[in-house]
């Protein structure tokens, strides 16, 4: 006994000595901290204030000083943290952790360690080397009486430590330390929070309820001593952790206890903020307190058990083992960086991989590690287990943990659950967190401080934004917390940190307790679910492995490890087959797969699985942030998890990785929430930034590779889809799968069916993530390519994202969200019923939605040129997709669309072989071997299932839009009703269109006729099908945004033509167009000969049938319309044939080539509009368009020479229009003079045509090259004699847009929005007298399409005409009923080229054409240099041409026969001029009515009678026609568009806005950041606009906060505006758009308060009028003694004369000033923007943007602002990302 007592006494003495050493060390540390604080906080108030202000300003400006960062923040942080930073912090963290671990373990402080473990580790304390660790242990002990086991025991040698003794000891230590502190810092604890509670003095307790601020300025006051903290908060580690975080020691303990992942307590400010001191606290806490040494808890248990002799040195070996295990387990891998990537930064979706390592959800930490969570992790678990169990309770209390706004359930749950689950269970999740051992070793609550830390740095910057917007991310956090405990910690923490985890710090203890309970429950669930998920994931991983095994070598392999969630995300992202296997796990990944989403496709579900580009071109699919982007997974937070999804599911992504050995090469989320993002994944990275790069090499370099990839993808997709269907049928796979070149039609159909089955709300929800991914890409690249394929599934993923039922209720599976002003990815193609797609014949091309957000850079378009050579499908994609790397994107898009379209158009696939899309190498150049290539490509298309999927993917790139229903360009034979040769040509043209469109913001592919080897009949059929398809697509999209959808269909028309699938595909297009939001560009369906093999009748039928049947609804109408139109067409064709047989053959040759393109486009535009129209509308449009359609069909059917001649008349008008449009002098065709009009006297032309008609053989249409060559050879009068139709390469996008909008069906569809600028419309043949629109705008929409195709014969394609800004589909209908043509005409400054436009604009019906014939020479001579001056205003640019077009349509409907037209043309010049004037007047009236009706009457533009006159470089003699009369479009015309708002979209829009803002917060590139911010702004505006119908006050708040946000953003952009770097112009344009937005927001704020302002003005007016109020004279005392009067002086004696204003009046005046200030600001900001446009020489850019999207005025709605800004940003991204391809 005596010996035992002696031993005990010795032990006690030893402990006392150790404690004394620890106290000394603590004192030293405190003194050191005090010195640091003295440096930082002992400054004078003024100095501190100045410094805080300066730092705040710097943070706002994105300026960061390293020294200041180091002193202010736990780790240097950037607004856009870099991966390098993450690595550095991770490396430091590990080192610190190791050091801390060694110190603490040597000291023997294991707070949670069992008594045995602690006792075993106590001997380490005996070593002097562990002084630091001892100091930590003492501080920790002092902080928490429960935790101060070791310290108290050591302090009382002879007694077992009691909480009182411990407290006393702690108090003594604190006093001792405080005495040593400099008196300057010492402030007696008066229970008053210093600095209003912002900071605490060392001895001063902190208010625990003070929310941790984002830390704009470091808290004031010296760091609290650990002893003082322990005294004041001896019982609550949470309070101390927040208040005493400044003390390295106390902070260390509290941090270790409260939150292992939290920032070092020393770095935390007394008020709970993170001071982020890296230096001095580090010695105390190796990680600056962020990571509690795992050994810290060992000492505690020994104390609790009782004083025991220090364990033998063998514990040191244990410590070393633990060190090795822990730190080996958490190397500086992506996981290791986690501690530095706290949840708070998770919201930075675009943030660099710095956050890769951040644990997506803390909750998962508690969840048992996924199978093989990491073999490395496991060793940590054993040592950690003891730690975690004790820590868990502590974690609940520490304010740091509470600081995490998220319910710590996931965080604390990790530690808390361990007690419930057992130390090991808890440990396992921690181990997963352990990737940074410091995090793991401390309890997960430390994670909160971690997040808060990041939150501070990011949040300091975000706080301005998010707080200004009052996004109430805390609400988001709550919602997220509700979703699943596992994910809640992840999302809520990041959100809370984002929202500025200030409020979250309140009630931390309660939250922690609740969280612990939740965590325990969640952990149990997680364990169960993880076990299940491990099985599923293993299976899925196998599937993913197979999928990855396929040639899909891009991120698929990476994603494969992601197992369920990743594969599911990939599938949902539309990576269809390739990613399907990997996606299988997490189809609904939005919820549980959120983490997986992070891994898979950056940003919640990789949205559209773009992350790995599982689609044929993974790179393109990776438009969405690649998994390498650590922040990508953060997007998942925004996606509501499936209700059934448990927290375990959230862990599942990590589990997938955990299942096997943790592979750092495979993206995944460990159970702890740590995300493994392989940085080495080039595919993902490349995909993110240069999708086209990956795709292009494949497309350009290796068609075989593409095919092989496609085959692999197809196989993978099939397998994956099957698996997914089995696992999750609801998972939406993209309706479009990977290219299925080799897949059979049945396989395609099956895939489509599977995909459709998979199209579910979850899929849509996942798609919601797609915009996020696209956002990141959009910042750097136009998202066109990767977004399209990435969205390939494209459109479905982003569409589903836009329309995901979870995120946003979708109008229908095939419908678009149809946000009135939103061209963005709001439509969901995924939901398109397969039946619809199957109904659409495979020849049809799906719509390419106009993605408002992603702007495919034009450079990519150039790249598509290369790719175009490699594959025909690529060209289609490029045109569809709006990205410069169209070809790469094209492949993906084609693959995606091919997948969906292959199934839908399985029947068409065989047909597709018949026609091969003519591929154009250059943007404007057709391939010389277009026909052969087309044939080959068509065959390839059959194999690869090339659909207009490219357009679909491109639409996604442009924004979530419908993708297609595009069907593989299956063109069995030209003769077949499904003859698709023209379609393939259309595909080629579509590429061109895409390239040009990509240049323009909307995806309005420049439609360029490509020579089609197909026969005339096929061309005619195609033209009809195309026109009908375009109409249908435009009409369907018109529902949301008629004009945009119309132009979208127009833009896609080439793709449809390229698809050139059977006319029946029009239904698909219609469906897709319906799906497409109005804003989105619809890919025109190339309906080749659906209705009739006979060229004329079947053409008419097809056109009408396609137009009407493009949608199931229009199918019934199509029959009637087809019959009616066929009759009209027959009549018109007969007349035209009689009259224009002469013009036929040459025109036929050229037109056959061009008609295959333009005709298809025109036809497509017609059917699309018809689709939109109700059956009655369709029938009426067909009736009105009957003449135009007949002419169009005749033109489209090259077989009908008569029809051609008839159309040629209209073609003359169109040629005139086109000539003006395309004459470089007139500014047409980008002022490149790309349109060559053959201008011969009509008589000569007629003679030639007669001769040709005599030789009436249908000559194969010249290849685009031939046409171009002919045109180039003789621009004025090359080949076609009478046909004045331009042989020009008219921007198909322009014409197609117009043509789409022109169909009379469009009248009803467009609601007065005439956006019928399509290549077809421009080329409307004479037969389409009604349709003939001078600018190629479809006068009669249906007829216009056919006429346009005829014009193509007459028009040579020199260079793809770049789509004019007006061509934007979204805006065309809206802004340009006929004005688009006018604008083009006006835009083309052809002073030399005889702006016959002016006459043409005045030209009403074909009477003008007669006049033109008579006046041809005179007019050509007189008007040679007559340039049509573009009015300064875009509205002014709407020229009389619109009216003329309307008149022409009406007249053509009335005067359907070409004979009448010719007669009218034969009328005397006087009569013609009179008629023109009258017609112009009529047209104006009509335009007013039709504008509302959205009918586009193609008024024959009085142009030089011959095309040559219009086209000639030297102005040919042109009869002076009445000067162009500007048509001013009323802004009331566009009001109809915005009536379609769906309140269901409010939440989706808000989520999109938040995603983009967070992505911008983490973006490092200034330009990308500004564009993302601006995108977020417009989404906020759409949200506010939608809210306006419900809650005016909330709307006011939203607008006001948005204004504050945009002002803040603009302030950050100012330094770049004046810079001279290459981005100078782009930054200036961003500033212009920002100023426009600010102006309109200010005006909106005034309008919202206009009623109040009126009342105030009335009251104030009454007050001043009545003279109420006492008048104060300077010398006369007033009845009321002035406040400033001096007693000695007479009252008022010193008061200046004035009037006393009552308080109520004063308040009203203040309010009035506020409201009127908004008005003043609106105009002032608008003027600033105008000045910046002029001074910066951005007039051309803005003018183009106005033309394409409609002018932005103070009358513009928020939807229009959205479209306009999105289009501008898209164009900017294209220019910045791909300047070379511009």
Swiss-Prot record:
InterPro entries: AF4/FMR2, AF4/FMR2_CHD, HMGI/Y_DNA-bd_CS. Residues 42-84, 150-313, 434-515, 605-637, 691-732, 768-820, 839-891, 911-1064, 1091-1126, 1166-1234, 1296-1327, 1386-1420, 1450-1484, 1674-1701 are annotated as: Disordered. It is found in: Nucleus. Residues 435-447 have a biased composition (Pro residues). Residues 465-475 have a biased composition (Acidic residues). Residues 623-634, 973-982, 1308-1318, 1450-1460 have a biased composition (Polar residues). GO terms for molecular function: DNA binding; transcription coregulator activity. Residues 54-80, 450-463, 691-701 have a biased composition (Basic and acidic residues). GO terms for cellular component: nucleus; super elongation complex. Residues 859-869 have a biased composition (Basic residues). Pfam families: AFF4_CHD. One of its GO terms (biological process) is regulation of cytoskeleton organization. Residues 920-932 bind DNA. The modification Phosphothreonine is found at residue 443. The modification Phosphoserine is found at residues 472, 474, 878-879, 949, 951, 1457. Its main location: nucleus. The keyword DNA-binding applies. Keywords: Developmental protein, DNA-binding, Nucleus, Pair-rule protein, Phosphoprotein, Transcription, Transcription regulation. Residues 164-180, 211-260, 484-515, 609-622, 714-730, 782-805, 929-972, 996-1018, 1033-1064, 1105-1116, 1174-1196, 1461-1484, 1674-1694 have a biased composition (Low complexity). The keyword DNA-binding applies. Coiled coil: none annotated. This is AF4/FMR2 family member lilli.
